[in-house]
């Protein structure tokens, strides 16, 4: 699994845990829906740390909490 695939999997899991849709995440994170949908597509562009930070804020987790998961170890 690539780091991009792991990041997408983690965001997808956190969305499911919160019963949150990508459009709601976009609003909470201050991102456009197209940015979030593009981010969630593992075949699209690589994620920047700025986008990851905003997504973490939208999900209500710190960047440290986000990466503190087995898939990143």
For each predicted feature, which ranges?
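Short, basic-rich loop-to-helix N-cap that marks the start of a DNA-contacting helix
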Residues: 43-54
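A short, Lys/Arg-rich alpha-helix, primarily the initiator
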Residues: 1-20
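Residues within the helices of the helix-turn-helix
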Residues: 12, 23, 53, 64
């Amino acid at each position: 699994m690539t780091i991009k695939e792991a990041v997408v999997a983690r965001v997808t899991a956190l969305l499911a845990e919160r019963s949150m849709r990508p459009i709601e995440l976009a609003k909470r994170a201050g991102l456009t829906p197209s940015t979030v949908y593009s981010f969630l597509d593992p075949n699209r562009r690589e994620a920047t740390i700025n986008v990851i930070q905003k997504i973490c804020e939208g999900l209500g987790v710190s960047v440290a909490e986000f990466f503190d998961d087995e898939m990143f170890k």
